[in-house]
Amino acid sequence: MDNIEVRGARTHNLKNINLIIPRDKLIVVTGLSGSGKSSLAFDTLYAEGQRRYVESLSAYARQFLSLMEKPDVD
């Protein structure tokens, strides 16, 4: 996997956004206030990463952790 793909992101101000982000690179997201930068970074990418990490843990360990909602993506 050389890229992180986001398809159809619909979190807060994001309206069916598709993007490909290269892995192991420094990425900068810029835009106007309210354009969805934080929605992309925290509510989509971070939330999905945390969800996948927690799902990889044992059922015993998962019971002690709160899980973020799955992002609204395709």
UniProtKB/Swiss-Prot annotation:
<keyword id="KW-0067">ATP-binding</keyword>
<keyword id="KW-0238">DNA-binding</keyword>
<dbReference type="GO" id="GO:0006281">
    <property type="term" value="P:DNA repair"/>
</dbReference>
<keyword id="KW-0547">Nucleotide-binding</keyword>
<dbReference type="InterPro" id="IPR027417">
    <property type="entry name" value="P-loop_NTPase"/>
</dbReference>
<comment type="subunit">
    <text>Forms a heterotetramer with UvrB during the search for lesions.</text>
</comment>
<dbReference type="GO" id="GO:0003677">
    <property type="term" value="F:DNA binding"/>
</dbReference>
<keyword id="KW-0267">Excision nuclease</keyword>
<keyword id="KW-0228">DNA excision</keyword>
<keyword id="KW-0677">Repeat</keyword>
<dbReference type="GO" id="GO:0005737">
    <property type="term" value="C:cytoplasm"/>
</dbReference>
<keyword id="KW-0963">Cytoplasm</keyword>
<dbReference type="GO" id="GO:0009432">
    <property type="term" value="P:SOS response"/>
</dbReference>
<comment type="similarity">
    <text>Belongs to the ABC transporter superfamily. UvrA family.</text>
</comment>
<keyword id="KW-0227">DNA damage</keyword>
<keyword id="KW-0742">SOS response</keyword>
<feature type="binding site">
    <location>
        <begin position="31"/>
        <end position="38"/>
    </location>
    <ligand>
        <name>ATP</name>
    </ligand>
</feature>
<protein>
    <recommendedName>
        <fullName>UvrABC system protein A</fullName>
    </recommendedName>
</protein>
<keyword id="KW-0234">DNA repair</keyword>
<dbReference type="GO" id="GO:0004518">
    <property type="term" value="F:nuclease activity"/>
</dbReference>
<comment type="function">
    <text>The UvrABC repair system catalyzes the recognition and processing of DNA lesions. UvrA is an ATPase and a DNA-binding protein. A damage recognition complex composed of 2 UvrA and 2 UvrB subunits scans DNA for abnormalities. When the presence of a lesion has been verified by UvrB, the UvrA molecules dissociate.</text>
</comment>
<dbReference type="GO" id="GO:0005524">
    <property type="term" value="F:ATP binding"/>
</dbReference>
